[in-house]
Regions:
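N-terminal catalytic or cofactor-binding beta/alpha core of small enzyme domains
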Residues: 30-182
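Active-site-adjacent substrate-binding region
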Residues: 174-201
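Anion (oxyanion) recognition and catalysis
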Residues: 68-69, 191, 214
């Protein structure tokens, strides 16, 4: 797309310009895959993408919605109130649906009595719709996808260190708060922070978005804090925004 003076507008096609530049209200407000439906929040034209994928992680929702009031980017906020969603009447962790292998393992785990045919149908639904959601969550070149998560007493950075390529534990006494990234250049920046951080480029396939990001080579940062620690998550997100390009 070009301006009237002939100068190109980088990264914007004519269709995008007409559909979103002149008529921003035409941009979709929701996107989904199977039982996972996401509300889309837009602010400006930043290359950042944000995600809150688990419906029971209320701290992450509040922090992300607050963040989007003052920062540019596109955020995807799941509308479910529960950790799992339904696919063909089966339970599925939405952060295990980004590969067929991961989705099948999770469907089998969460639905031990399900018939093989029912699992097969659920996988078919995911296979047909997965790429559209992945395209939305993938940042433009040079951008980054930031996922906000909350955890409980049963999970911490200690579970990630053994399967990580590198780690920097600046706050070993606060193991529930950490960054997980997939790009070594981002790790070099994040390790200068006062927070815990791990780099995972070669973790075992589990259907998560972080594994997909590592496989496809796009920048991804997962920001984990304990449930209820909104101010800590807000502080870490602001650090990330300030210091990461």
């Amino acid at each position: 797309m070009s301006r009237a003076d002939g100068a190109a507008i980088p990264g914007v096609s004519r269709r995008q310009f007409l559909g979103l530049g002149w008529f921003p209200w035409l941009a979709p407000r929701h996107i989904g895959l199977a039982g996972a439906r996401f509300r889309i929040l837009r602010n400006g034209r930043s290359q950042r993408r944000y995600l809150r994928i688990h419906g029971n992680e209320e701290t992450a929702r509040r922090v992300l919605e607050r963040h989007m009031e003052t920062h540019e980017g596109i955020a995807y906020v799941i509308e479910s109130r529960t950790r799992v969603v339904a696919v063909e009447s089966l339970k599925l962790d939405p952060n295990r649906m980004f590969s067929r292998v991961g989705a099948e393992a999770n469907l089998t785990l969460l639905n031990p009595g399900a018939a093989a045919e029912q699992v097969r149908r659920a996988l078919g639904v995911l296979d047909r719709g997965r790429e559209k959601l992945v395209r939305a969550l993938t940042p433009p070149k040079g951008g980054v996808t930031i996922a906000l998560h909350n955890n409980s007493s049963g999970y911490s950075v200690a579970a990630e260190v053994p399967i990580s390529d590198r780690s920097s534990l600046r706050q070993p006494g606060i193991p529930h708060a950490f960054f997980l990234c997939t790009d070594p250049r981002d790790f070099e920046v994040l390790k200068t922070s006062p927070y815990n951080v791990v780099l995972q480029q070669h973790g075992p396939e589990d259907g998560s978005l972080s594994r997909l990001a590592a496989a496809r080579g796009f920048r991804y940062v997962n920001l984990e804090v304990a449930a209820g620690e909104a101010e800590r998550q807000w502080e870490m997100l602001n650090w990330l925004e300030w210091f990461m390009g």
